[in-house]
Amino acid sequence: MELGPEPPHRRRLLFACSPPPASQPVVKALFGASAAGGLSPVTNLTVTMDQLQGLGSDYEQPLEVKNNSNLQRMGSSESTDSGFCLDSPGPLDSKENLENPMRRIHSLPQKLLGCSPALKRSHSDSLDHDIFQLIDPDENKENEAFEFKKPVRPVSRGCLHSHGLQEGKDLFTQRQNSAPARMLSSNERDSSEPGNFIPLFTPQSPVTATLSDEDDGFVDLLDGENLKNEEETPSCMASLWTAPLVMRTTNLDNRCKLFDSPSLCSSSTRSVLKRPERSQEESPPGSTKRRKSMSGASPKESTNPEKAHETLHQSLSLASSPKGTIENILDNDPRDLIGDFSKGYLFHTVAGKHQDLKYISPEIMASVLNGKFANLIKEFVIIDCRYPYEYEGGHIKGAVNLHMEEEVEDFLLKKPIVPTDGKRVIVVFHCEFSSERGPRMCRYVRERDRLGNEYPKLHYPELYVLKGGYKEFFMKCQSYCEPPSYRPMHHEDFKEDLKKFRTKSRTWAGEKSKREMYSRLKKL
């Protein structure tokens, strides 16, 4: 039955429902007299839902629609592409839509054009044709009744890759989740070859609903996730879920560890309690020993002597380097070298009050006086920085009493002692406790020596301070003192001498500071 013409802004949806007898028409109007009597299309669709075939029914029939069908597809909204809830254009836009219709190009894939009679239209018909037309029974002799074709289930990447080459179409343009899972069909037809079906997915048995159910077809999208076909999953993936668990019996000890050497994969594990061998770099060059071969060594190591020889040669290349070039630079601290950085200190030094000075013990002083280092020392000078009355009360054998800095400079720097035959010239300073006067005199000599020579050259590069001074040396080595006695600085009998020498020292110290200032101004 064909409805009369209506205004363009009012769209009508015609459905066909054919009973088993072939004499009845193929297409049956969905909206009857009740729709004209005032019911909306959606209300009428709800009332006549039980008359539709394919939506929630217990049986499915394949649909074949030819490409040359007289149904045409005009400009529609997004809901029209999905097949549900057709919207209506406004009265002002109806004329413009008929004269210059705009078709959405990428809104719906080509394969979904045959999902329903409303979407399967021929582009060759006129544009002003009605939206839906009755299908001629002569053109559909094979189909006495038809149903709306359900949208195709979204295709996975694996299926797209496998079917894309066979069908020759772009399957990536299919709309994802355009309809509920219950509306998806099990077969689809290739539009380029009418009458032939290419099954994308094998038919499944979804949860069927009876005609008495109140299911309107709009099922939750989550239902489709629970009804996935097992055929969509590749066989290799399905075997992971269905195959039984198998325990591997491979011996893990025979496998190579991640950070183990490949040559030691088959060798036995070394004992944890065995002391590790020293590296060849730490041992001296001449005392390098052959490494003991392990009992379980692999045959590759024993049959490949060239590789072992190369590795051994590479190890010896670092050990055979001159000690004077690498080890002296890395191992020697500049504080352990004498003033000109040419060699190390001869005597063993001890910690003292001033960290920038080198201290020796009274025992070292006594050993030098005994001539123990005679073959290494050309001149051994002992500077006694105490006041003259202290020096006369007792001093070390061979010591020179110079309590004024000017006197020390004249004695040492005006006519410096030159070392010969590689022997050293050593100067030792001391006072009563080696706390103030001795260290101050030692610094002064080094300072004046630096000013008189080009860095780092020095006349006296090796200077020492006697730790504990004369008092400690007298208590430990009294036999090396002349006379063997000790007179302190604050002796009651020499208070006047103490004041005189202190005043002289302070006056000379003030004049010294003025002289240094004048000398610096002259250099500027």
UniProtKB/Swiss-Prot annotation:
Residues 264-317 are annotated as: Disordered. The gene is CDC25A. Phosphorylated by CHEK1 on Ser-76, Ser-124, Ser-178, Ser-279, Ser-293 and Thr-507 during checkpoint mediated cell cycle arrest. Also phosphorylated by CHEK2 on Ser-124, Ser-279, and Ser-293 during checkpoint mediated cell cycle arrest. Phosphorylation on Ser-178 and Thr-507 creates binding sites for YWHAE/14-3-3 epsilon which inhibits CDC25A. Phosphorylation on Ser-76, Ser-124, Ser-178, Ser-279 and Ser-293 may also promote ubiquitin-dependent proteolysis of CDC25A by the SCF complex. Tyrosine protein phosphatase which functions as a dosage-dependent inducer of mitotic progression. Directly dephosphorylates CDK1 and stimulates its kinase activity. Also dephosphorylates CDK2 in complex with cyclin-E, in vitro. Residues 376-482 form the Rhodanese domain. The modification Phosphothreonine is found at residue 507. GO terms for biological process: cell division; cell population proliferation; G1/S transition of mitotic cell cycle; G2/M transition of mitotic cell cycle; positive regulation of DNA replication; positive regulation of G2/M transition of mitotic cell cycle; positive regulation of G2/MI transition of meiotic cell cycle; regulation of cyclin-dependent protein serine/threonine kinase activity. Stimulated by B-type cyclins. Stimulated by PIM1-mediated phosphorylation. Its EC number is 3.1.3.48. It catalyses: O-phospho-L-tyrosyl-[protein] + H2O = L-tyrosyl-[protein] + phosphate. The phosphodegron motif mediates interaction with specific F-box proteins when phosphorylated. Putative phosphorylation sites at Ser-79 and Ser-82 appear to be essential for this interaction. Changing residue 513 to A: Increased stability following IR treatment. Residues 303-312 have a biased composition (Basic and acidic residues). The active site is at residue 431. Gene3D superfamilies: Rhodanese-like domain. This is M-phase inducer phosphatase 1. Keywords: Cell cycle, Cell division, Hydrolase, Mitosis, Phosphoprotein, Protein phosphatase, Ubl conjugation. The modification Phosphoserine is found at residues 76, 79, 82, 88, 107, 124, 178, 279, 293, 321, 513, 519. A motif (KEN box) lies at residues 141-143. Changing residue 279 to A: Increases basal stability and impairs CHEK1-dependent degradation following checkpoint activation.
